[in-house]
Amino acid sequence: ENHQVPEGFFDEDVFLIFQHYHALDRWEHCLDTPLTFPIPLGPFNDLYKDIEIKPISQRKYDFVFVGQVPKTGTRDSFKRGLDKLIKEKGDEFKYRIEFTDGFSKGLKPKEYMELLADSKLSLCPAGAYSMETFRFFESTLMGAIPVVDRLPKFWYYEEASFFKGAWDVLDNTLSKSLNYLQTGSCRNMLKGLAMYNNDVLNVESLASRMKHIVDQRHGNIESSSEY
């Protein structure tokens, strides 16, 4: 989860590496190399396939979060912002918050996915060591719009639907996001969410994209060998 150059990168017999938590430069952009290509984490389980996707207007919760606050400190500002929100304006929202003792130690997997499917928004703070999380993709697949404070600059976030704001103004971010979801303007976002699930997070589509990258790599090698 550290966004470093992967093991084997300097081996002469390595043709191509598809990498989760792809290497980043100092500006949190994708580190462009001829040997590596970033791919999304996707969900931690495939239970989403059997769960009904409800319309936004029929969902029980405004926002949810079930997860840990790791000792690495990556979610400290998130926890402070969330505590402040609940204390000062918690009665203005419908939510479910549960803090757990570690990764995947909260709700049962299906129960967790069903919870996401019953929420309009999903709070998606950074992981223990990376800005990226399974939660972002699980939420997207369940139709719960992710709320983030920052994301790395990878191709698979470019067309993703999400709301962005600093955790210390979480109440403002949530209010604006929920109000937006009540307007007709949100249709394009929800349509984009569905297209994202059917394209970027679709197994067959991702495999096709990876094949294209492999073919492209073959072509580059063949072209360079001619000179």
Question: Which residues make up each language-model segment?
Answer:
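Intrinsic disorder/low-complexity signature
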Residues: G42, V169, S185, A194-D199
